Regions:
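Short, charged low-complexity linear segments at domain edges
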Residues: 3, 42-44, 183-184, 366-375, ...
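N-terminal export and membrane-targeting signals
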Residues: 1-13, 240-241, 439
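C-terminal motif of bacterial Sec signal peptides marking the signal peptidase cleavage site
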Residues: 16-20
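Alpha/beta-hydrolase-fold enzymes
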Residues: 297-390
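Post-signal peptide N-terminal segment of mature Sec-exported envelope proteins
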Residues: 30-55
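Gly/Pro-rich cap/lid or specificity-loop segments adjacent to the active site
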Residues: 50-333, 390-391, 396-520
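Bacterial signal peptide processing site
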Residues: 22-25
């Protein structure tokens, strides 16, 4: 163990055991009604019979400090809306709200607002869970067409424990982390690619559980919900308005289950599927990535991009080279994540994003992989931290066996030519992680719920959307589902139409017509 790793490990141990201390964004806010669910009003209404709490401004606010430029620089972004302001802060949250485990974490938060945002406007809280640092997610949203959302209410991103600005988890040894980043593609073992992915996942699991035990499961979704409630208490407000994107929607649902009396608004944006095994979730994510890539191909052709008349064939050729190892040390998994990272973003102009990605991939095909390496590094920083590994493995239920991945491999490679093989392999890395209880889900909800889904979502896909909206419907509350016909993640990042609906919902819980569709 290096001196740096030892010091970081000691730091985590003290905190744990010490005393408690992209497809194009739309500028069109038009809404088309496609269908209505049975029993759901077909017009925007509020339900006076429901006792819906109001959003509140914090009574005791956090010690915010301006972090606008440092945040933009950290993620290579430029403001998408004039007057954009980022403020950063931290607060302490106990490792275990029940008191069974001692210690505390520092939880990082960031507030995004405009200079014109009313000072009395109550904040909405955003969590993207383990998908990516919530602060990074909010920064990307704010660098896009965010004026409609941020002009109405400030949005506060809360990083999940172990991720982003929150107390970092540093538990995987550098050599293991490098191998994990490539899913073992360049490991010296003579095993096949499936066994190599299992091996590196097991090594990372042993290293992290050895360091973090007996609190290795204190990074689950339910604990993230407790951190949300700790923010509520720090603010001195009765209830929160929560936007959960992707995996963060699971955190939002867990908060609704654990603290139903402290929830004022609930937006489920591109939620991860519930009640299914990890191979099903992996396939849903792959379907979303393929849909987002198809949208990129169409835009690329329309722009006469550098990938030529057949962008999909050109990228498939590049992926073949990566799989064969000719882009080493860049692995095929890193290339896949780099492409997905670019497709997810809503920052800046959609056409410019498409041209930039095309140029990066074209250069790599011509032998210059420098830009692709930079993109892969940004993707690894966004998706591949130790904290995310721990959180994702803790969240997961029903991880696949190596044989089930082998069985799916050929079918997925044919069905999903760009992303299929990688998705099946990625599902193996957490197979050795200790099983944690499933995240709690609400059986009743006393407030209306707004759910959003994108047609081309490269983060989670939309295959699990019906299950989530079905869960919400089963609670008996009013709800509305909106579909964005664009691509990217989350929906509020790319769709002004969806932002308009969220801003209106924040005021008095008014819902748009169920089944509404926002244009690409």
């Amino acid at each position: 163990m290096t001196q740096k790793r030892t010091l970081l490990a000691v730091g985590v141990a003290v905190l744990m055991f010490g005393s408690a201390c992209a497809g194009g964004p739309s500028s069109r806010p038009d809404v088309a009604v496609e269908q209505n669910s049975p029993g759901t009003p077909d017009e925007t209404t509020t339900d006076s019979a429901q006792d819906i709490p109001e959003l509140q401004t914090p009574v005791d606010d956090l010690a915010w400090a301006d972090c606008t430029q440092s945040t933009l620089d950290a993620y290579g972004l430029t403001p998408g809306t004039p007057g954009l302001v980022f403020d950063c802060a931290d607060f302490e949250s106990p490792v275990d709200a029940s008191g069974e485990m001692f210690g505390s974490f520092s939880v990082g938060v960031m507030r995004a607002r405009l200079g014109s945002t009313p000072s009395e406007a109550p904040p909405l809280v955003l969590t993207s869970g383990a998908d990516r640092s919530s602060i990074a997610t909010l920064a990307d949203i704010a660098a896009g067409p965010s004026g409609t959302l941020l002009g109405a209410n400030p949005v506060v991103a809360i990083d999940r424990r172990g991720i982003g600005r929150s107390t970092a988890v540093d538990c995987v040894k550098p050599d293991t982390r490098e191998t994990l980043r490539g899913l073992g593609q360049f490991a010296s073992s003579g095993n096949d690619v499936v066994d190599r992915a299992v091996d590196v996942g097991r090594d990372a699991t042993i290293e992290c559980t050895d360091l973090l035990q007996p609190q290795e499961l204190a990074f689950a979704t339910s604990y993230a919900a407790d951190d949300l409630n700790q923010l509520r208490m720090a603010w001195g407000v009765d209830a929160l308005g929560v936007i959960g994107t992707g995996n963060g929607a699971s955190t939002a649902l867990a908060y609704a289950a654990r603290y139903p009396e402290h929830l004022a608004r609930l937006v489920l944006d591109s939620p991860t599927g519930i009640g299914v095994d990890q191979m099903t979730l992996a396939e849903q994510k792959t379907q979303g990535r393929e849909a987002a890539f198809a949208a990129f191909v169409l835009r690329c052709r329309a722009l006469r991009c550098s990938l030529g008349d057949a962008p999909q064939d050109a990228v498939a050729d590049l992926m073949g080279r990566a799989t064969a190892g000719t882009l080493a040390p860049l692995s095929s998994h890193e290339v896949v994540d780099a492409i997905a990272y670019a497709l997810s973003s809503s920052a800046g102009d959609a056409s410019r994003r498409a041209l930039d990605l095309s140029d990066t991939l074209s250069s790599a095909r011509s032998g210059d992989v420098s830009e692709l390496r930079q993109l892969a590094s940004r993707a690894a920083a966004a998706y591949g931290t130790d904290g995310q590994f721990v959180a994702r493995c803790t969240d997961g239920q029903q991880w696949p066996s190596p044989q089930s991945v082998r069985d799916a491999g050929a079918t997925w490679a044919e069905r999903y030519p760009i992303f299929g093989t990688d998705a099946a392999m990625t599902a193996l890395t957490c197979a050795s992680w200790p099983t944690a209880p499933a995240a709690p889900l609400p059986s009743s909800l006393s407030i209306p719920v707004l759910s959003l889904s994108g047609s081309g979502d490269p983060m989670v896909g939309n295959g699990g959307f019906a299950a989530v909206t079905g869960l919400v419907a089963s609670t008996g509350t009013r709800s509305a589902a909106m579909t964005w016909q664009g691509s990217g993640h989350p929906v509020v990042g790319g769709s002004v139409c969806a932002q308009t609906a969220v801003a209106a919902y924040a005021v008095d819980a008014a819902l748009p017509p169920d089944g509404s569709a926002c244009p690409a």
